[in-house]
């Protein structure tokens, strides 16, 4: 298929994931038409307009078409790994103990600062390829392992280059307020000053960040410190996101909502008030079962409270070297169902429509609607539930990015 190709996918079943459609918006005996990288028709094949009769046809053999999957929370660009910390945790050390002993995020900072931009791209591509192989068409990538201006810029530039190396959409997030670098000697206020006055202006000037994130936790930054970063992001007209309530309830979810954040992520310790605040603000709850599983957390995010409040829920891998070295969004869906008791529809919507909402790109992708990008995943399955049910099996038949297979 060429960039300006016109293609009809015939003999398909289509899960449109439209907002108010029941049963994932499933259409049997359907066709989907792509023209100039956009969806121009998605509906019953017997109602296909005659104007598309001359288009190239691809017979889907009754396979299921969904929106291309979206991994809306990753730390994909990093250097090295932290397998040694994994061994420590198996021996009983907690995430906090590893971090306070100089491990955790700070060890990844040392590795990233020593790596070149080319090194980072080279090391990250295999992780990205693993996601792409499962039908992923959009990936969010955070910085946050540089923690100084040049290293954060290096990370974000490496992330943007991923989208040049592969047919995938990359959304970049500046996560300067991720951890306190060792050279700050515990002075968090001075470091936040650097984030606000040194890093963020340079990153904003170069247009390297689609969003600004922070880690609101006792071992990272407190709500008043995060608020300073968010105020600065607002001044630069950059939307915000937040790692919130992962290890304790500092009311990070409510803080994120108060800034109209695109999303608040993790949320194991979020309370009902936080869920309600997020629903009112339209802030998406991005749940990260890979991290929950990997650090053997026991506190589950309040899925029932999110449902009751009407908070939208997304799922993501949280790929990172310390707490979620996970590169499978299919497994993430299974974890969302088995660990968090999310429904099949919630899981599939969570890696398509709601993931797009969490990135502020629902107007472009995430559902199969006329005018949206032709980002598709075509699956060799009989029931949508198989995407969530199977473990260690990839039923992807074809992946389509901007209309191209």
Curated annotation (Swiss-Prot):
What does this protein's UniProt record list under function?
Catalyzes the hydrolytic cleavage of the carbon-nitrogen bond in imidazolone-5-propanoate to yield N-formimidoyl-L-glutamate. It is the third step in the universal histidine degradation pathway.
Cofactors (names) = Zn(2+); Fe(3+)
Detail which positions bind N-formimidoyl-L-glutamate. 145, 320, 322
Residue positions annotated to bind Zn(2+) are 73, 75, 243, 318
Task: Report the family membership.
Answer: Belongs to the metallo-dependent hydrolases superfamily. HutI family.
Residues binding 4-imidazolone-5-propanoate are 82, 145, 178, 246, 323
Q: Which UniProt keywords apply?
A: Cytoplasm, Histidine metabolism, Hydrolase, Iron, Metal-binding, Zinc
> NCBIfam families this protein is in?
hutI
Annotated Fe(3+) binding sites: 73, 75, 243, 318
Q: What is its main location?
A: cytoplasm
Tell me what gene encodes this.
hutI
Its localization reads: Cytoplasm
Q: Which organism is it from?
A: Brucella ovis (strain ATCC 25840 / 63/290 / NCTC 10512)
- Cofactor comment: Binds 1 zinc or iron ion per subunit.
CC per GO annotation: cytoplasm
Q: Which InterPro entries match?
A: Amidohydro-rel, HutI, Metal-dep_hydrolase_composite, Metal_Hydrolase
Give the metabolic or biological pathway.
Amino-acid degradation; L-histidine degradation into L-glutamate; N-formimidoyl-L-glutamate from L-histidine: step 3/3
The catalytic activity, as recorded, is:
4-imidazolone-5-propanoate + H2O = N-formimidoyl-L-glutamate
One Gene Ontology biological process: L-histidine catabolic process to glutamate and formate
Name recorded for this polypeptide:
Imidazolonepropionase
Please name one Pfam family that this protein belongs to: Amidohydro_1
Q: Name one GO molecular function term.
A: iron ion binding
Q: What EC number(s) are associated with this protein in UniProt?
A: 3.5.2.7
């Amino acid at each position: 298929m060429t960039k300006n190709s016109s293609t009809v996918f015939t003999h398909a079943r289509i899960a449109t994931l439209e907002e108010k459609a029941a049963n994932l918006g499933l259409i049997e005996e359907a066709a989907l038409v792509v023209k100039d990288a956009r969806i121009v028709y998605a509906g019953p094949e017997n109602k296909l307009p005659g104007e598309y009769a001359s288009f190239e046809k691809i017979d889907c053999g009754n396979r299921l078409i969904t929106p291309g999957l979206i991994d809306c929370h990753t730390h994909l660009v990093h250097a090295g790994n932290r397998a040694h910390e994994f061994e420590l945790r198996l021996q009983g050390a907690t995430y906090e103990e590893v971090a306070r002993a100089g491990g955790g995020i700070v060890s990844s900072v040392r590795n990233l600062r020593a790596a070149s931009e080319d090194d980072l791209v080279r090391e990250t591509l295999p992780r990205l390829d693993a996601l792409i192989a499962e039908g992923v068409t959009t990936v969010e990538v955070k910085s946050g392992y540089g923690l100084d201006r040049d290293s954060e810029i290096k990370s974000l530039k490496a992330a943007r280059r991923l989208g040049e190396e592969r047919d995938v959409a990359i959304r970049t997030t500046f996560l300067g307020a991720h951890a306190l670098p060792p050279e700050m000697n515990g002075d968090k206020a001075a470091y936040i000053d650097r984030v606000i006055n040194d890093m963020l202006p340079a990153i904003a000037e170069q247009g390297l960040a689609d969003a600004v994130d922070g880690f609101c936790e006792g071992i990272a930054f407190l709500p008043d410190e995060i608020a300073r970063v968010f105020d600065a992001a607002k001044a630069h007209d950059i939307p915000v996101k937040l790692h919130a309530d992962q290890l304790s309830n500092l009311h990070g979810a409510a803080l994120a909502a108060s800034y109209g954040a695109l999303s608040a992520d993790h949320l194991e310790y979020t309370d009902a008030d936080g869920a309600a605040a997020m629903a009112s603000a339209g802030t998406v709850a991005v749940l990260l079962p890979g991290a929950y599983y990997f650090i053997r957390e026991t506190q589950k995010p309040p899925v029932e409270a999110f449902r009751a409040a009407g908070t939208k829920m997304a799922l993501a891998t949280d790929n990172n070297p310390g707490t979620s070295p996970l590169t499978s969004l299919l497994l993430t869906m299974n974890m969302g169902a088995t660990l968090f008791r999310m429904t099949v529809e919630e899981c599939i919507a969570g890696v398509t429509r709601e993931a797009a909402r969490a990135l502020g790109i629902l107007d472009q992708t995430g559902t199969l609607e006329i005018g949206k990008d032709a980002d598709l995943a075509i699956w060799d399955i009989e029931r949508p539930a198989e995407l969530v049910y199977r473990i260690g099996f990839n039923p992807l038949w074809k992946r389509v990015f901007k209309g191209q297979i």
